Swiss-Prot record:
Lineage: Bacteria, Pseudomonadati, Campylobacterota, Epsilonproteobacteria, Campylobacterales
Entry's Gene Ontology molecular function annotations: 3-dehydroquinate synthase activity; metal ion binding; nucleotide binding
Binding site for NAD(+): 61-66, 95-96, 119-120, 132, 141-142, 159-162
Names of the cofactor(s): NAD(+); Co(2+); Zn(2+)
Protein name: 3-dehydroquinate synthase
InterPro entries: Dehydroquinate_synthase (IPR050071), DHQ_synth_AroB (IPR016037), DHQ_synth_fam (IPR030963), DHQS/DOIS_N (IPR030960), DHQS_C (IPR056179)
The entry's keywords: Amino-acid biosynthesis, Aromatic amino acid biosynthesis, Cobalt, Cytoplasm, Lyase, Metal-binding, NAD, Nucleotide-binding, Zinc
Organism (species): Helicobacter pylori (strain ATCC 700392 / 26695)
Subunit details: Homodimer.
Length: 343
């Protein structure tokens, strides 16, 4: 069992990487999972969980269910179970479940503990660590949420064996995102190694990167913005396709390529660096065909990104490999010219 400590100002917690241990709780626990994960992994968790009382709430699977209705269902289950401030919630699932349970636990009784048990690669390397929580709205993705750190995170690689290839590759996109912005050595490892032979090490390295970033910038005031590489465009893609055509990681892969196009046009990436990132995405089958339906509407959606300020879009753009820059005040004409390639 490997451990990563995340020491923050208000609380410390650990990420455990290895076989899911027995979890002993003296309080009530509400498990929230989705309709697919519950069938695959809920019995495994229930075997290892000892609590004062356990209840299970199952939400429909998919990004489009990360909404007010699902949030209300979670909270209603908590009220019916009479959870108190000493009780906790357990998120068993991917990024959607992690985000929703984190948010629900942050607002129930003004905040109770929750444990993250991520079952997808994307959730293990990204969504389950760092405390960003939220739900989607008709206006955009993750526009309502909070910062609420988990009590603990348990990552069992056995969960990943049940993932379809497409879901696994979507998680790799988030690893590439972190590598390109923060760690040139991880980029080289992904380029030269067979991921199957070093998966645990890559997950550990990715979580370590995110942990270091979160410790430095918990509330996303500066360096943590790098974790949003590909997300300004990616969230607009998800919204335009009604969260149905692409998995989150797939949309982020497209978003990274759009960001690379913009960085290349601004002289922040050389053609060699641009092609290097492109080839890495190709290696993991993360090149997708996508055409923007309405160029003007897509451009306007970019302003709904949470990083935008004073009617200015902020883009996270790679500055070479292993570094990034927050770019703003980019002329509309420059952005539109880049987007025309995708129209």
């Amino acid at each position: 069992m490997q451990e990563i400590l995340i020491p923050l100002k208000e609380k410390n917690y650990k990420v455990f990487l290895g076989e899911l241990p027995e979890i002993k709780l003296k309080q009530k626990a509400l498990i929230i999972s989705d309709s697919i994960v519950a069938g695959l992994h809920l019995p495994y968790l229930l075997e290892r969980l000892k609590a004062l009382e356990v209840r299970v709430c199952v939400i429909e699977s998919g990004e489009k269910y990360k909404n007010f209705h699902s949030l209300e269902r979670i909270l209603n289950n908590a009220f019916e179970m009479q959870l108190n401030r000493h009780s906790l919630m357990i998120a068993l699932g991917g990024g959607v479940i992690s985000d929703m349970v984190g948010f629900a636990s942050s607002i129930y009784f003004r905040g109770i503990d929750f444990i993250n048990i991520p079952t997808t690669l994307l959730a293990q390397v990204d969504a389950s660590v760092g405390g960003k929580t939220g739900i989607n709205t008709p206006y955009g993705k993750n526009l309502i949420g909070s910062f609420h750190q988990p009590k603990a995170v348990y990552m069992d690689l056995a969960f990943l064996k049940t993932l379809e290839k497409r879901e696994f590759q979507a998680g790799v996109a988030e690893i590439i995102k972190m590598a390109v912005c923060f760690d040139k050595n991880l980029v080289e490892r992904l380029e030269t190694k067979d991921l199957k032979d070093c998966l645990e090490e890559v997950i550990f390295q990715s979580v370590n990167i995110k942990a270091q970033v979160v410790v430095q910038d918990e509330k996303e005031q500066n360096i943590r913005a790098g974790l949003n590489y590909g997300h300004t465009f990616g969230h607009a893609i998800e919204k335009e396709t009604d969260y149905e055509r692409f998995l989150h990681g797939e949309a982020i892969a497209i978003g990274m390529r759009m960001a690379n196009d913009l960085a290349l046009s601004l002289g922040m990436l050389t053609l060699k660096e641009y092609e290097r990132i492109e080839n890495l995405l190709k290696k993991f089958d993360l090149i997708f065909h996508y055409k923007i339906l309405d160029l003007q509407k897509f451009y306007e959606r970019l302003f709904l990104d949470k990083k935008s300020e004073n009617k200015t879009i902020k883009f996270i753009l790679p500055k070479g490999v292993g570094a990034f820059e927050v770019a703003s005040h980019i002329p509309k004409e420059t952005i539109i010219k880049v987007l025309e390639k995708w129209h």
